[in-house]
Amino acid sequence: MDAITIEMQVTVVPAEFDDIRTTSLVGYLDARFADLVARLGEPRRYDEAGFKIDAEWLLKDASGLLGALTVYNYKNGRNYNGAHAAPVEQITDWNVGGRGGASVALAKALFGAHFTAA
């Protein structure tokens, strides 16, 4: 049997911290901050020296079938690296957190070729 490609349309809604508890790295995203804001809305922002992230989106599949995702920068922003690092608006390398295959499917549906599974 030949492979069948199925394109999925998903709707994501903001998630709460309880929704993303116990997530871990599932992949990487190559995207401009402005494009993520246009697609996902404004992220949660953190302004704390030594903190490992600067911005984070908490998302979940509205149907509940594909679980939750986090999109965040990790150790590549000013919080972790100081003022000489690029501001969050210039970051293009993002981590994606989730729970296994369902989260990978959700990330692929949302971000297509910009997402690479870990």
Task: Kindly label every feature range from the protein language model.
Residues 2-118:
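Residues within mature, well-folded domains
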